[in-house]
Regions:
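Feature for intrinsically disordered/low-complexity regulatory segments and propeptides
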Residues: 115-117
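N-terminal cofactor/phosphate-binding cores enriched in small/glycine residues
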Residues: 20-91
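Phosphate/ATP-binding catalytic cores across multiple sugar-kinase/actin-like superfamilies
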Residues: 302-328
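Flexible beta->alpha loop and helix N-cap segments adjacent to enzyme active/binding sites
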Residues: 27-46, 51-54, 94-97, 102-106, ...
Length: 615
Protein backbone atom coordinates (compact mmCIF):
# COMPACT_ATOMS: atom_id res chain seq x y z
CA UNK A 1 0.00 0.00 0.00
CA UNK A 2 0.98 3.63 -0.30
CA UNK A 3 2.59 5.26 2.72
CA UNK A 4 2.33 8.78 3.96
CA UNK A 5 3.48 10.48 7.14
CA UNK A 6 0.73 12.22 9.07
CA UNK A 7 1.55 15.64 10.61
CA UNK A 8 2.77 13.83 13.76
CA UNK A 9 5.14 11.86 11.55
CA UNK A 10 3.18 8.68 12.22
CA UNK A 11 3.36 6.48 9.16
CA UNK A 12 0.12 4.98 7.90
CA UNK A 13 -0.50 2.47 5.15
CA UNK A 14 -3.59 2.02 3.02
CA UNK A 15 -3.22 -1.76 3.25
CA UNK A 16 -3.17 -1.71 7.05
CA UNK A 17 -0.22 -4.06 7.69
CA UNK A 18 2.93 -1.99 7.64
CA UNK A 19 6.50 -3.22 7.51
CA UNK A 20 8.73 -1.19 9.83
CA UNK A 21 12.48 -1.54 9.28
CA UNK A 22 15.05 0.26 11.42
CA UNK A 23 18.56 0.61 9.99
CA UNK A 24 21.47 0.95 12.43
CA UNK A 25 25.13 1.89 11.97
CA UNK A 26 26.90 0.97 15.22
CA UNK A 27 30.49 0.58 16.51
CA UNK A 28 32.01 2.50 13.61
CA UNK A 29 32.40 6.23 13.01
CA UNK A 30 29.28 8.36 12.39
CA UNK A 31 26.77 6.04 14.06
CA UNK A 32 23.18 6.65 13.00
CA UNK A 33 19.67 5.26 12.67
CA UNK A 34 17.06 5.36 9.89
CA UNK A 35 13.44 4.20 9.72
CA UNK A 36 11.64 2.82 6.66
CA UNK A 37 7.92 2.12 6.59
CA UNK A 38 6.79 -0.01 3.64
CA UNK A 39 9.98 0.85 1.75
CA UNK A 40 9.80 4.61 2.24
CA UNK A 41 12.17 6.64 4.35
CA UNK A 42 10.36 8.33 7.27
CA UNK A 43 13.24 9.46 9.50
CA UNK A 44 17.05 9.41 9.59
CA UNK A 45 19.48 11.05 12.00
CA UNK A 46 23.09 10.85 13.18
CA UNK A 47 23.92 10.28 16.83
CA UNK A 48 26.56 13.06 16.85
CA UNK A 49 23.75 15.65 16.71
CA UNK A 50 22.35 14.41 20.03
CA UNK A 51 25.66 13.60 21.72
CA UNK A 52 27.42 16.81 20.51
CA UNK A 53 30.59 14.84 19.64
CA UNK A 54 31.66 14.93 15.97
CA UNK A 55 31.58 11.54 14.18
CA UNK A 56 30.64 9.83 17.47
CA UNK A 57 31.16 6.04 17.55
CA UNK A 58 29.44 3.53 19.85
CA UNK A 59 25.71 2.77 19.63
CA UNK A 60 23.05 5.24 18.34
CA UNK A 61 20.72 5.05 21.38
CA UNK A 62 19.15 8.50 20.96
CA UNK A 63 18.86 8.33 17.16
CA UNK A 64 17.07 5.00 17.37
CA UNK A 65 14.64 6.25 20.03
CA UNK A 66 13.93 9.49 18.12
CA UNK A 67 13.14 7.68 14.84
CA UNK A 68 10.54 5.50 16.58
CA UNK A 69 9.07 8.39 18.60
CA UNK A 70 8.78 10.55 15.48
CA UNK A 71 6.79 7.87 13.65
CA UNK A 72 4.68 7.07 16.71
CA UNK A 73 5.94 3.47 16.78
CA UNK A 74 6.57 1.39 19.87
CA UNK A 75 9.79 -0.70 19.86
CA UNK A 76 7.66 -3.84 19.66
CA UNK A 77 6.29 -2.70 16.28
CA UNK A 78 9.72 -2.91 14.60
CA UNK A 79 9.74 -5.86 12.18
CA UNK A 80 13.46 -5.83 11.36
CA UNK A 81 16.57 -4.31 12.92
CA UNK A 82 19.03 -4.05 9.99
CA UNK A 83 22.65 -3.54 11.09
CA UNK A 84 25.21 -2.35 8.52
CA UNK A 85 27.98 -4.78 9.49
CA UNK A 86 28.30 -8.52 9.11
CA UNK A 87 30.77 -10.22 11.44
CA UNK A 88 30.61 -13.37 9.29
CA UNK A 89 31.57 -11.67 6.01
CA UNK A 90 34.79 -12.84 4.32
CA UNK A 91 35.83 -14.98 7.30
CA UNK A 92 38.18 -17.14 5.21
CA UNK A 93 39.96 -14.09 3.84
CA UNK A 94 40.32 -12.63 7.33
CA UNK A 95 41.63 -15.90 8.74
CA UNK A 96 44.13 -16.26 5.89
CA UNK A 97 45.30 -12.65 6.34
CA UNK A 98 45.67 -13.03 10.13
CA UNK A 99 47.61 -16.28 9.74
CA UNK A 100 49.92 -14.77 7.13
CA UNK A 101 50.63 -11.39 8.74
CA UNK A 102 49.88 -11.78 12.48
CA UNK A 103 49.08 -8.06 12.81
CA UNK A 104 49.39 -6.42 16.21
CA UNK A 105 46.82 -3.60 16.17
CA UNK A 106 44.21 -2.70 13.59
CA UNK A 107 42.79 -6.14 12.91
CA UNK A 108 42.86 -7.07 16.60
CA UNK A 109 40.94 -3.84 17.35
CA UNK A 110 38.44 -4.87 14.70
CA UNK A 111 38.14 -8.32 16.27
CA UNK A 112 37.21 -6.68 19.59
CA UNK A 113 34.72 -4.58 17.67
CA UNK A 114 33.13 -7.69 16.18
CA UNK A 115 32.62 -9.14 19.65
CA UNK A 116 30.57 -5.99 20.37
CA UNK A 117 28.51 -6.70 17.25
CA UNK A 118 27.77 -10.17 18.61
CA UNK A 119 26.31 -8.61 21.77
CA UNK A 120 24.21 -6.22 19.67
CA UNK A 121 20.85 -7.95 20.31
CA UNK A 122 21.34 -7.34 24.04
CA UNK A 123 22.36 -3.69 23.47
CA UNK A 124 19.32 -2.99 21.25
CA UNK A 125 17.06 -4.83 23.69
CA UNK A 126 18.25 -2.83 26.70
CA UNK A 127 18.16 0.44 24.72
CA UNK A 128 14.50 -0.11 23.78
CA UNK A 129 13.45 -2.24 26.80
CA UNK A 130 12.65 -5.26 24.67
CA UNK A 131 13.22 -8.99 25.19
CA UNK A 132 16.67 -9.91 23.70
CA UNK A 133 15.21 -13.09 22.17
CA UNK A 134 12.66 -10.97 20.30
CA UNK A 135 15.41 -8.66 18.99
CA UNK A 136 17.60 -11.61 18.00
CA UNK A 137 14.74 -13.05 15.95
CA UNK A 138 14.35 -9.74 14.11
CA UNK A 139 18.02 -8.82 13.64
CA UNK A 140 19.55 -8.87 10.16
CA UNK A 141 23.24 -8.20 9.48
CA UNK A 142 23.94 -6.50 6.14
CA UNK A 143 27.59 -6.34 5.12
CA UNK A 144 29.19 -2.86 5.19
CA UNK A 145 29.78 -2.42 1.44
CA UNK A 146 26.41 -3.78 0.27
CA UNK A 147 24.92 -1.28 2.77
CA UNK A 148 26.88 1.54 1.09
CA UNK A 149 25.77 0.39 -2.39
CA UNK A 150 22.12 0.10 -1.31
CA UNK A 151 22.20 3.54 0.36
CA UNK A 152 22.89 5.17 -3.01
CA UNK A 153 21.08 2.83 -5.42
CA UNK A 154 17.71 2.40 -3.76
CA UNK A 155 17.06 6.11 -3.09
CA UNK A 156 18.32 7.26 -6.51
CA UNK A 157 16.04 8.43 -9.32
CA UNK A 158 17.51 5.72 -11.61
CA UNK A 159 15.77 2.50 -12.62
CA UNK A 160 19.06 1.17 -13.99
CA UNK A 161 22.59 2.28 -13.01
CA UNK A 162 26.13 1.31 -12.17
CA UNK A 163 26.74 1.45 -8.42
CA UNK A 164 30.12 1.93 -6.74
CA UNK A 165 31.36 2.38 -3.16
CA UNK A 166 34.88 3.58 -2.31
CA UNK A 167 35.98 4.10 1.30
CA UNK A 168 38.58 3.23 3.95
CA UNK A 169 37.29 -0.24 4.63
CA UNK A 170 34.46 -2.09 6.34
CA UNK A 171 33.94 -5.84 6.73
CA UNK A 172 37.37 -6.30 5.05
CA UNK A 173 36.36 -4.54 1.78
CA UNK A 174 37.53 -1.09 0.59
CA UNK A 175 35.94 -0.79 -2.87
CA UNK A 176 33.02 -2.55 -4.52
CA UNK A 177 30.85 -2.10 -7.55
CA UNK A 178 27.91 -3.64 -9.30
CA UNK A 179 24.65 -2.80 -11.02
CA UNK A 180 21.13 -1.74 -10.16
CA UNK A 181 18.15 -3.07 -12.12
CA UNK A 182 14.82 -2.01 -10.65
CA UNK A 183 14.70 -3.60 -7.18
CA UNK A 184 17.70 -5.83 -7.82
CA UNK A 185 21.23 -4.80 -6.81
CA UNK A 186 24.13 -7.12 -7.71
CA UNK A 187 27.76 -6.77 -6.65
CA UNK A 188 30.18 -7.59 -9.49
CA UNK A 189 33.58 -6.98 -7.92
CA UNK A 190 35.34 -6.11 -4.66
CA UNK A 191 38.78 -4.87 -3.65
CA UNK A 192 39.79 -6.20 -0.24
CA UNK A 193 41.74 -4.96 2.79
CA UNK A 194 44.54 -3.81 3.02
CA UNK A 195 44.34 -2.00 -0.36
CA UNK A 196 42.26 1.18 -0.07
CA UNK A 197 42.01 4.63 -1.67
CA UNK A 198 40.38 5.95 1.49
CA UNK A 199 43.41 4.80 3.44
CA UNK A 200 45.78 6.48 0.98
CA UNK A 201 43.93 9.79 1.49
CA UNK A 202 43.92 9.29 5.27
CA UNK A 203 47.68 8.62 5.40
CA UNK A 204 48.58 11.85 3.57
CA UNK A 205 45.95 13.79 5.57
CA UNK A 206 47.71 12.65 8.76
CA UNK A 207 51.15 13.33 7.24
CA UNK A 208 49.98 16.90 6.49
CA UNK A 209 49.22 17.47 10.19
CA UNK A 210 45.44 16.96 10.24
CA UNK A 211 45.06 14.13 12.76
CA UNK A 212 41.34 14.14 13.54
CA UNK A 213 38.84 11.63 12.23
CA UNK A 214 37.19 13.25 9.19
CA UNK A 215 39.95 15.82 8.48
CA UNK A 216 40.22 14.76 4.81
CA UNK A 217 37.85 17.65 3.97
CA UNK A 218 40.52 20.11 5.07
CA UNK A 219 43.09 18.64 2.67
CA UNK A 220 40.58 18.75 -0.20
CA UNK A 221 40.01 22.45 0.59
CA UNK A 222 43.76 23.12 0.78
CA UNK A 223 44.58 21.35 -2.51
CA UNK A 224 43.59 24.17 -4.94
CA UNK A 225 46.17 26.48 -3.33
CA UNK A 226 49.06 24.30 -4.54
CA UNK A 227 50.48 22.76 -7.71
CA UNK A 228 50.60 18.93 -7.83
CA UNK A 229 54.39 18.81 -8.06
CA UNK A 230 54.72 15.74 -5.80
CA UNK A 231 52.26 13.64 -7.81
CA UNK A 232 55.01 11.37 -9.18
CA UNK A 233 56.26 10.66 -5.65
CA UNK A 234 52.75 9.85 -4.46
CA UNK A 235 52.20 7.55 -7.44
CA UNK A 236 54.89 5.27 -5.98
CA UNK A 237 52.50 4.56 -3.08
CA UNK A 238 50.14 2.54 -5.27
CA UNK A 239 49.89 0.62 -8.54
CA UNK A 240 46.88 0.74 -10.84
CA UNK A 241 46.11 -2.76 -12.14
CA UNK A 242 43.93 -4.06 -14.98
CA UNK A 243 40.15 -4.34 -14.50
CA UNK A 244 39.82 -1.32 -12.21
CA UNK A 245 41.95 -2.82 -9.45
CA UNK A 246 44.81 -1.19 -7.50
CA UNK A 247 47.37 -2.15 -4.87
CA UNK A 248 49.04 -0.03 -2.21
CA UNK A 249 52.79 -0.41 -1.67
CA UNK A 250 52.31 -1.68 1.88
CA UNK A 251 55.85 -0.73 2.95
CA UNK A 252 54.58 2.87 3.30
CA UNK A 253 51.53 1.94 5.41
CA UNK A 254 51.08 0.47 8.88
CA UNK A 255 47.33 -0.25 9.02
CA UNK A 256 47.79 -3.84 7.84
CA UNK A 257 50.71 -4.86 10.05
CA UNK A 258 49.44 -3.48 13.33
CA UNK A 259 50.62 -0.75 15.63
CA UNK A 260 47.78 1.60 14.62
CA UNK A 261 45.68 2.61 17.59
CA UNK A 262 41.99 2.75 16.69
CA UNK A 263 39.18 3.47 19.12
CA UNK A 264 35.54 3.03 18.24
CA UNK A 265 34.30 3.41 21.80
CA UNK A 266 31.51 5.66 23.00
CA UNK A 267 33.02 8.95 21.82
CA UNK A 268 34.93 10.54 18.95
CA UNK A 269 36.71 7.88 16.85
CA UNK A 270 40.49 8.18 16.90
CA UNK A 271 43.03 6.73 14.51
CA UNK A 272 46.77 6.63 15.11
CA UNK A 273 49.15 7.25 12.19
CA UNK A 274 48.60 4.75 9.37
CA UNK A 275 51.91 5.49 7.60
CA UNK A 276 55.43 4.16 8.27
CA UNK A 277 58.74 6.07 8.64
CA UNK A 278 59.40 5.12 4.99
CA UNK A 279 56.74 7.67 3.92
CA UNK A 280 58.66 10.47 5.68
CA UNK A 281 61.87 9.22 4.05
CA UNK A 282 60.12 9.61 0.67
CA UNK A 283 58.32 12.93 1.27
CA UNK A 284 60.29 14.63 4.05
CA UNK A 285 59.22 15.25 7.65
CA UNK A 286 55.51 15.34 8.42
CA UNK A 287 53.85 18.61 9.48
CA UNK A 288 53.03 18.82 13.18
CA UNK A 289 49.49 20.03 13.90
CA UNK A 290 50.77 23.26 15.50
CA UNK A 291 53.11 24.19 12.62
CA UNK A 292 52.01 26.69 9.94
CA UNK A 293 50.82 25.37 6.58
CA UNK A 294 53.52 26.17 4.00
CA UNK A 295 53.75 26.12 0.21
CA UNK A 296 55.05 22.55 0.07
CA UNK A 297 52.10 21.38 2.20
CA UNK A 298 49.72 23.01 -0.29
CA UNK A 299 51.57 21.26 -3.12
CA UNK A 300 51.34 17.92 -1.30
CA UNK A 301 47.58 18.37 -0.82
CA UNK A 302 47.23 19.20 -4.54
CA UNK A 303 49.29 16.13 -5.44
CA UNK A 304 47.20 13.85 -3.23
CA UNK A 305 43.96 15.13 -4.75
CA UNK A 306 45.36 14.60 -8.27
CA UNK A 307 46.56 11.04 -7.56
CA UNK A 308 43.31 10.18 -5.76
CA UNK A 309 41.31 11.41 -8.77
CA UNK A 310 43.44 9.39 -11.22
CA UNK A 311 42.94 6.27 -9.11
CA UNK A 312 39.20 6.80 -8.53
CA UNK A 313 38.60 7.45 -12.25
CA UNK A 314 40.64 4.32 -13.05
CA UNK A 315 38.07 2.38 -10.98
CA UNK A 316 35.04 4.28 -12.32
CA UNK A 317 36.05 4.00 -15.99
CA UNK A 318 36.30 0.24 -15.57
CA UNK A 319 32.91 0.18 -13.83
CA UNK A 320 31.38 2.20 -16.68
CA UNK A 321 32.87 -0.05 -19.38
CA UNK A 322 31.75 -3.29 -17.73
CA UNK A 323 28.25 -2.14 -16.75
CA UNK A 324 27.76 -0.09 -19.95
CA UNK A 325 25.57 2.29 -17.95
CA UNK A 326 25.49 6.07 -18.39
CA UNK A 327 24.26 6.49 -14.79
CA UNK A 328 26.28 6.13 -11.60
CA UNK A 329 25.22 5.85 -7.95
CA UNK A 330 28.25 6.55 -5.76
CA UNK A 331 28.74 5.94 -2.02
CA UNK A 332 31.41 5.42 0.65
CA UNK A 333 33.53 8.00 2.46
CA UNK A 334 35.42 8.82 -0.77
CA UNK A 335 32.11 9.86 -2.37
CA UNK A 336 32.30 12.91 -0.07
CA UNK A 337 35.21 14.11 -2.25
CA UNK A 338 33.06 16.71 -3.99
CA UNK A 339 35.98 18.00 -6.09
CA UNK A 340 36.42 14.57 -7.71
CA UNK A 341 32.63 14.11 -8.01
CA UNK A 342 32.33 17.27 -10.09
CA UNK A 343 34.77 15.81 -12.65
CA UNK A 344 33.14 12.39 -13.06
CA UNK A 345 31.08 13.36 -16.12
CA UNK A 346 34.10 14.96 -17.77
CA UNK A 347 36.61 12.16 -17.05
CA UNK A 348 34.49 9.01 -17.34
CA UNK A 349 31.68 7.76 -19.58
CA UNK A 350 29.01 8.50 -16.97
CA UNK A 351 26.47 11.19 -17.83
CA UNK A 352 24.38 11.24 -14.61
CA UNK A 353 25.74 10.90 -11.08
CA UNK A 354 23.75 10.43 -7.86
CA UNK A 355 25.31 10.71 -4.39
CA UNK A 356 22.99 10.78 -1.37
CA UNK A 357 23.79 13.29 1.39
CA UNK A 358 25.05 10.73 3.95
CA UNK A 359 27.44 8.96 1.57
CA UNK A 360 29.86 8.08 4.40
CA UNK A 361 29.35 5.48 7.11
CA UNK A 362 26.44 7.53 8.48
CA UNK A 363 24.44 6.44 5.42
CA UNK A 364 24.99 2.71 5.93
CA UNK A 365 22.05 2.59 8.39
CA UNK A 366 19.80 3.78 5.55
CA UNK A 367 21.44 1.31 3.15
CA UNK A 368 21.05 -1.69 5.45
CA UNK A 369 17.35 -0.91 5.89
CA UNK A 370 16.77 -0.57 2.13
CA UNK A 371 18.80 -3.74 1.42
CA UNK A 372 16.51 -5.69 3.76
CA UNK A 373 13.35 -4.14 2.28
CA UNK A 374 14.41 -5.04 -1.26
CA UNK A 375 15.32 -8.60 -0.25
CA UNK A 376 11.59 -9.19 0.39
CA UNK A 377 9.68 -10.93 -2.42
CA UNK A 378 7.71 -8.45 -4.50
CA UNK A 379 9.20 -5.35 -2.86
CA UNK A 380 8.82 -2.32 -5.11
CA UNK A 381 10.74 0.93 -5.42
CA UNK A 382 8.57 3.99 -4.96
CA UNK A 383 10.90 6.26 -3.01
CA UNK A 384 13.42 8.79 -4.38
CA UNK A 385 15.45 11.03 -2.07
CA UNK A 386 14.87 14.58 -3.34
CA UNK A 387 15.83 16.43 -0.16
CA UNK A 388 17.85 15.80 3.00
CA UNK A 389 15.38 16.91 5.68
CA UNK A 390 14.78 13.69 7.62
CA UNK A 391 15.65 14.79 11.18
CA UNK A 392 13.90 16.50 14.12
CA UNK A 393 11.94 19.76 13.89
CA UNK A 394 10.58 22.14 16.54
CA UNK A 395 7.40 24.23 16.50
CA UNK A 396 7.19 27.96 17.27
CA UNK A 397 5.89 27.20 20.77
CA UNK A 398 8.99 25.13 21.62
CA UNK A 399 11.21 27.86 20.16
CA UNK A 400 9.41 30.53 22.22
CA UNK A 401 9.89 28.49 25.40
CA UNK A 402 13.64 28.17 24.75
CA UNK A 403 13.91 31.92 24.06
CA UNK A 404 12.23 32.66 27.41
CA UNK A 405 14.70 30.34 29.18
CA UNK A 406 17.67 32.19 27.65
CA UNK A 407 16.21 35.72 27.73
CA UNK A 408 18.65 36.97 30.38
CA UNK A 409 21.69 35.80 28.38
CA UNK A 410 20.68 37.57 25.17
CA UNK A 411 19.52 40.71 26.97
CA UNK A 412 23.06 40.94 28.39
CA UNK A 413 24.41 40.90 24.82
CA UNK A 414 21.97 43.61 23.67
CA UNK A 415 19.92 41.26 21.50
CA UNK A 416 16.31 42.07 20.66
CA UNK A 417 13.65 39.35 20.19
CA UNK A 418 10.71 39.55 17.79
CA UNK A 419 8.17 37.02 16.59
CA UNK A 420 6.80 37.50 13.07
CA UNK A 421 3.37 36.39 12.01
CA UNK A 422 3.98 36.44 8.25
CA UNK A 423 6.75 34.16 6.95
CA UNK A 424 6.99 35.93 3.56
CA UNK A 425 7.67 39.33 5.09
CA UNK A 426 10.20 37.74 7.50
CA UNK A 427 11.99 36.14 4.53
CA UNK A 428 12.11 39.51 2.73
CA UNK A 429 13.46 41.21 5.89
CA UNK A 430 16.10 38.45 6.33
CA UNK A 431 17.20 38.82 2.70
CA UNK A 432 17.63 42.57 3.29
CA UNK A 433 19.82 41.83 6.35
CA UNK A 434 22.01 39.54 4.22
CA UNK A 435 22.26 42.17 1.48
CA UNK A 436 23.35 44.64 4.17
CA UNK A 437 26.33 42.44 5.07
CA UNK A 438 24.92 40.83 8.21
CA UNK A 439 25.61 37.18 9.07
CA UNK A 440 22.39 35.22 9.70
CA UNK A 441 21.84 31.95 11.56
CA UNK A 442 18.94 30.21 9.76
CA UNK A 443 17.08 27.39 11.54
CA UNK A 444 13.95 25.99 9.83
CA UNK A 445 12.00 22.74 9.68
CA UNK A 446 13.52 19.27 9.94
CA UNK A 447 17.27 18.90 10.42
CA UNK A 448 19.41 17.70 7.52
CA UNK A 449 20.55 14.08 7.17
CA UNK A 450 24.25 13.84 6.31
CA UNK A 451 27.20 16.09 6.98
CA UNK A 452 26.06 19.14 4.95
CA UNK A 453 23.78 21.93 6.15
CA UNK A 454 21.39 22.48 3.24
CA UNK A 455 19.23 25.42 4.27
CA UNK A 456 17.58 24.18 7.47
CA UNK A 457 20.51 24.46 9.93
CA UNK A 458 22.70 26.98 8.07
CA UNK A 459 24.71 30.13 8.62
CA UNK A 460 24.04 32.46 5.66
CA UNK A 461 25.81 35.52 4.29
CA UNK A 462 26.17 37.76 1.23
CA UNK A 463 28.35 36.02 -1.42
CA UNK A 464 29.20 39.40 -3.05
CA UNK A 465 31.43 40.50 -0.14
CA UNK A 466 35.03 39.37 -0.57
CA UNK A 467 35.74 39.83 3.15
CA UNK A 468 32.89 37.53 4.20
CA UNK A 469 35.02 34.37 4.03
CA UNK A 470 37.51 35.65 6.56
CA UNK A 471 34.75 37.14 8.73
CA UNK A 472 32.99 33.78 9.04
CA UNK A 473 36.10 31.58 9.21
CA UNK A 474 37.81 33.68 11.86
CA UNK A 475 34.98 35.42 13.74
CA UNK A 476 32.27 32.77 13.77
CA UNK A 477 33.50 29.31 12.79
CA UNK A 478 37.00 29.69 14.29
CA UNK A 479 38.56 27.48 11.62
CA UNK A 480 41.35 27.51 9.03
CA UNK A 481 41.42 30.48 6.64
CA UNK A 482 41.76 28.26 3.56
CA UNK A 483 38.38 26.52 4.04
CA UNK A 484 35.94 27.45 1.24
CA UNK A 485 32.25 28.33 1.52
CA UNK A 486 29.42 26.98 -0.56
CA UNK A 487 26.99 28.81 -2.84
CA UNK A 488 23.30 27.85 -2.57
CA UNK A 489 21.81 28.83 -5.94
CA UNK A 490 18.26 28.92 -7.32
CA UNK A 491 18.03 25.82 -9.52
CA UNK A 492 16.58 27.76 -12.46
CA UNK A 493 19.61 30.12 -12.56
CA UNK A 494 22.35 27.43 -12.41
CA UNK A 495 23.75 27.84 -15.93
CA UNK A 496 24.11 31.60 -15.52
CA UNK A 497 26.82 31.10 -12.89
CA UNK A 498 28.41 27.65 -13.42
CA UNK A 499 30.13 25.82 -16.28
CA UNK A 500 28.92 22.27 -17.01
CA UNK A 501 27.24 21.91 -13.64
CA UNK A 502 24.66 19.29 -12.74
CA UNK A 503 21.64 19.67 -10.48
CA UNK A 504 22.78 18.77 -6.96
CA UNK A 505 20.52 19.48 -3.97
CA UNK A 506 23.07 17.84 -1.64
CA UNK A 507 26.17 20.02 -2.20
CA UNK A 508 28.42 17.09 -3.15
CA UNK A 509 29.85 18.27 -6.48
CA UNK A 510 32.29 21.11 -7.18
CA UNK A 511 32.13 22.92 -10.55
CA UNK A 512 33.87 25.91 -12.16
CA UNK A 513 32.17 29.27 -11.68
CA UNK A 514 31.88 31.22 -14.95
CA UNK A 515 34.93 33.51 -15.20
CA UNK A 516 32.79 36.65 -15.63
CA UNK A 517 30.83 35.82 -12.43
CA UNK A 518 33.78 35.15 -10.11
CA UNK A 519 34.16 38.81 -9.14
CA UNK A 520 30.40 39.01 -8.51
CA UNK A 521 30.40 36.23 -5.88
CA UNK A 522 33.95 36.27 -4.44
CA UNK A 523 32.98 34.90 -1.01
CA UNK A 524 31.90 31.55 -2.51
CA UNK A 525 34.55 31.39 -5.26
CA UNK A 526 37.43 29.14 -4.16
CA UNK A 527 41.01 30.04 -5.06
CA UNK A 528 40.79 27.95 -8.27
CA UNK A 529 37.55 29.61 -9.41
CA UNK A 530 35.32 26.72 -8.33
CA UNK A 531 32.29 26.41 -6.05
CA UNK A 532 30.72 23.46 -4.20
CA UNK A 533 27.21 24.33 -5.19
CA UNK A 534 23.81 23.39 -3.82
CA UNK A 535 20.87 23.74 -6.21
CA UNK A 536 17.71 24.88 -4.40
CA UNK A 537 14.32 24.20 -5.98
CA UNK A 538 10.92 25.47 -4.90
CA UNK A 539 9.77 21.86 -4.68
CA UNK A 540 12.56 20.47 -2.47
CA UNK A 541 12.93 23.36 0.01
CA UNK A 542 10.24 26.03 -0.52
CA UNK A 543 11.18 28.26 2.45
CA UNK A 544 14.89 28.39 1.59
CA UNK A 545 14.05 28.93 -2.11
CA UNK A 546 11.84 31.92 -1.18
CA UNK A 547 14.63 33.43 0.94
CA UNK A 548 17.17 33.19 -1.91
CA UNK A 549 14.54 34.53 -4.33
CA UNK A 550 14.03 37.54 -2.02
CA UNK A 551 17.82 38.09 -1.90
CA UNK A 552 17.89 37.95 -5.71
CA UNK A 553 15.13 40.58 -5.93
CA UNK A 554 17.25 42.96 -3.84
CA UNK A 555 20.71 42.24 -5.30
CA UNK A 556 20.23 40.61 -8.72
CA UNK A 557 22.27 37.63 -7.42
CA UNK A 558 20.32 34.32 -7.02
CA UNK A 559 22.88 32.91 -4.56
CA UNK A 560 23.58 33.01 -0.83
CA UNK A 561 26.71 31.86 0.99
CA UNK A 562 25.74 28.77 3.02
CA UNK A 563 27.82 27.12 5.74
CA UNK A 564 26.81 24.72 8.48
CA UNK A 565 25.28 26.13 11.68
CA UNK A 566 27.99 25.13 14.17
CA UNK A 567 31.28 26.27 15.68
CA UNK A 568 33.74 23.38 16.13
CA UNK A 569 30.92 21.01 17.08
CA UNK A 570 28.31 18.95 15.22
CA UNK A 571 25.62 20.95 13.37
CA UNK A 572 23.05 22.33 15.82
CA UNK A 573 20.00 20.13 16.37
CA UNK A 574 17.80 22.10 18.82
CA UNK A 575 16.72 25.75 19.18
CA UNK A 576 18.68 25.87 22.46
CA UNK A 577 21.91 24.83 20.71
CA UNK A 578 21.26 27.40 17.96
CA UNK A 579 20.81 30.19 20.53
CA UNK A 580 23.97 29.07 22.40
CA UNK A 581 25.99 29.13 19.15
CA UNK A 582 24.55 32.55 18.23
CA UNK A 583 25.49 34.02 21.63
CA UNK A 584 28.95 32.40 21.60
CA UNK A 585 29.91 33.71 18.16
CA UNK A 586 29.57 37.05 16.41
CA UNK A 587 26.54 36.27 14.27
CA UNK A 588 24.31 39.32 13.75
CA UNK A 589 20.86 37.76 13.36
CA UNK A 590 19.26 34.44 14.29
CA UNK A 591 16.03 33.30 12.60
CA UNK A 592 14.41 30.20 14.18
CA UNK A 593 11.06 29.40 12.59
CA UNK A 594 9.34 32.80 12.75
CA UNK A 595 11.31 34.02 15.79
CA UNK A 596 14.15 36.51 15.32
CA UNK A 597 17.04 37.40 17.64
CA UNK A 598 18.94 40.47 16.44
CA UNK A 599 22.14 41.95 17.85
CA UNK A 600 22.36 45.71 18.24
CA UNK A 601 24.18 47.04 15.17
CA UNK A 602 27.75 48.15 15.67
CA UNK A 603 28.45 51.70 14.56
CA UNK A 604 31.29 50.58 12.28
CA UNK A 605 30.27 50.88 8.60
CA UNK A 606 29.97 47.63 6.66
CA UNK A 607 32.25 47.38 3.62
CA UNK A 608 30.46 47.58 0.30
CA UNK A 609 30.06 44.43 -1.82
CA UNK A 610 32.75 43.96 -4.48
CA UNK A 611 30.39 44.40 -7.44
CA UNK A 612 26.68 44.50 -7.94
CA UNK A 613 25.45 42.06 -10.54
CA UNK A 614 23.85 43.69 -13.49
CA UNK A 615 20.76 41.77 -14.54
Amino acid sequence: GTVHASPSGRAESSSGARVNIVGINAYHGDVSAALLVDGRLIAAVEEERFRRIKHVAGFPHQSLKWCLDFAGLSPGEVDVFAVSRDPRAHLWRKAWFLARHRPKGTVADRARNLSKLRSLPEVIASSLQLDPARVRARLRYVEHHPSHLASAAFVSPFDEAAVCAIDGFGDFVSTSWGRLNGSRLDTDQRIFFPHSLGLLYLAITQYLGFPKYGDEFKVMGLAPYGEPRYADKLRTLLRLLPDGAFELDLSYFSHWSGGVQMTWEDGEPTLGPVFTPKLEALLGPRRRADEPVQLHHEAMAASLQAVFEESAFHVLNHVQKTTRSARLCLAGGCAMNSVANGKIRERTGFKDVFVQPAAGDNGTSLGAAFAVWHSRPGATRDFVMEHSHWGPSFDDGEVGGEIERQREAFNEQRCAHRQWTDADSLDAWTAAQLADGRVVGWFQGRMEWGSRALGNRSILADPRRADMRDIINLRIKLREKFRPFAPSILLERLDEYFVGAAVDPFMLQVYPIRPEKRAVIPAVTHVDGSGRLQTVSERSNPRYWRLIKAFDRITGVPIVLNTSFNENEPIVLTPGQAIDCFLRTQMDVLVIGNHVLERARSTAPKPEPALSAAR
